[in-house]
């Protein structure tokens, strides 16, 4: 059996304007030519410029922030309703799952599903975790940090997702 081994250079992003993994952030929004062959467009046409809008979208829509006072996860899930999202805390991990069945959009029928898993810092107060979905589809998972690490026998528990009527007010960094 032949096994193809790729050099690590082929697995890296080609610069800050190209995402390193295509499907991490955009759940079924469609691909552009430069998403598949980013180096080809500049080779064929030296005057071709990448869309600035797409570059802005690639600049941190999904992110994890951990500072002195809180742990925060921001995730763009605009194609999912709160009923289609599940957020669980299992031991020291946050698991976010989104799934919707096949439905019609502008280009035909589409179904989407994703799983994300994040490790919680040991000093996050797991009894005060919250999760909300803004009107513009930004999921915000937040947990305050405490001074001493609390270990009260970790177990699995679900975190409800609440709907907000206003757009997300958390600026991306």
Curated annotation (Swiss-Prot):
This is Alpha-crystallin A chain. GO terms for molecular function: metal ion binding; structural constituent of eye lens; unfolded protein binding. Zn(2+) 3 binds at residue 154. Residues 1-63 are annotated as: Required for complex formation with BFSP1 and BFSP2. The gene is CRYAA. Zn(2+) 1 binds at residues 100, 102. Heteromer composed of three CRYAA and one CRYAB subunits. Inter-subunit bridging via zinc ions enhances stability, which is crucial as there is no protein turn over in the lens. Can also form homodimers and homotetramers (dimers of dimers) which serve as the building blocks of homooligomers. Within homooligomers, the zinc-binding motif is created from residues of 3 different molecules. His-100 and Glu-102 from one molecule are ligands of the zinc ion, and His-107 and His-154 residues from additional molecules complete the site with tetrahedral coordination geometry. It holds the Pfam family Crystallin. One of its GO terms (cellular component) is cytoplasm. Disulfide bonds join 131-142. The modification Phosphoserine is found at residues 45, 122. The modification N6-acetyllysine is found at residue 99. Belongs to the small heat shock protein (HSP20) family.
């Amino acid at each position: 059996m032949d096994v193809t081994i790729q050099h690590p250079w082929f697995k890296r992003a080609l610069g800050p304007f190209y995402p390193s993994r295509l499907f991490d952030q955009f759940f079924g929004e469609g691909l552009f030519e430069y998403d598949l062959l980013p180096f080809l467009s500049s080779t064929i046409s030296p005057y071709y410029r990448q869309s600035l809008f797409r570059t802005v979208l690639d600049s941190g829509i999904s992110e994890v922030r951990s500072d002195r006072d809180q742990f925060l996860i921001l995730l763009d899930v605009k194609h999912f309703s709160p009923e289609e999202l599940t957020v669980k805390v299992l031991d020291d991990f946050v698991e976010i799952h989104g799934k919707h069945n096949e439905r019609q959009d502008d280009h035909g029928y589409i179904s989407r599903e994703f799983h994300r898993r994040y490790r919680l810092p040991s000093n996050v107060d797991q009894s005060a975790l919250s999760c909300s979905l803004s009107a513009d589809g930004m999921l915000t998972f937040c947990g305050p940090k405490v001074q001493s690490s609390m270990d009260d026998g970790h177990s699995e528990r679900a975190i409800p997702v609440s709907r907000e009527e206003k757009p997300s007010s958390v600026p991306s960094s």
